[in-house]
From Swiss-Prot:
Species assigned in the record: Tapirus indicus
Domain of life of the organism encoding this protein: Eukaryota
Name of the protein described by the UniProt record: Apolipoprotein C-II
Coiled coil: none
Family assignment from sequence similarity: Belongs to the apolipoprotein C2 family.
Family matches, as PANTHER family: APOLIPOPROTEIN C-II
Lineage of source species: Eukaryota, Metazoa, Chordata, Craniata, Vertebrata
Length: 101
């Protein structure tokens, strides 16, 4: 083998060696990223749980039966009105699509 072939072989082996070393680094980074992601998820879930518990406690402390009845009444009236208008809109849309027969 000539010196050129030996030099080319050495360069190819050197490049392959760096590729192998470079391929191992992202796997370690992925493991670090997954642990970081897990930590972020756990902290967000703990914040969510504490916020939810605080909101439930506040609701229980300020619960008023008269206000609850008013809210339920408003909900039932608004639901009835919306269902009426949705029915009218559906009939108009069907007659528009169906056309004159």
């Amino acid at each position: 083998m000539g010196a050129r072939h030996l030099l080319a072989l050495l360069l190819v082996l050197l490049v392959l060696g760096f590729e192998v070393q470079g391929a191992q680094v992202p796997q370690q980074d992925e493991a670090a990223n997954t642990t970081l992601l897990t930590q972020v998820q756990e902290s967000l879930l703990s914040y969510w749980d504490s916020t939810k518990a605080a909101a439930q406690d506040l609701y229980k402390k300020t619960y008023l039966t008269t206000m609850d009845e008013k809210i339920r009444d408003m909900f039932s009236k608004s639901t009835a009105a919306v269902s009426t208008y949705v029915g009218i809109f559906t009939d108009q849309l069907l007659s528009l699509l169906k056309g004159d027969e």
